[in-house]
Amino acid sequence: MIEEKTYKIVYRKQFLEDIQLHKRAGRKSVLVKLAAIIEELKKHPMRGTGKPEPLIGDRRGQWPRRITAKHRLIYEIYEDVVTVDLISAAEHYGHK
């Protein structure tokens, strides 16, 4: 029987600030969707909701997931330590 890994979730400062921004703005649907995506990330960070695909260029190694048409969750996956590092959860790729 193959044991499925569970990824540890790490929250960077910018991600936590973005969550507060969504709370202050009353974006409950964004917060609900983020919670669901984070649960998915624990099991399979490279597939699932929000059209994940690796970024290229200066963001190589990072992955986006669509939260809304305007907002993206950006994260990095560290297979060696089975960790997903949540970087940000606001507007596209830091263009605020």
Can you name each region flagged by the protein language model?
Residues M1-K8, L16-V32, A36, I56, ...:
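Enriched for short, Lys/Arg-rich terminal
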Residues K8-I9, G48:
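Residues that recognize and position ribonucleotide moieties
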Residues E39-R65:
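A short, surface-exposed loop/turn module that caps and links secondary-structure elements
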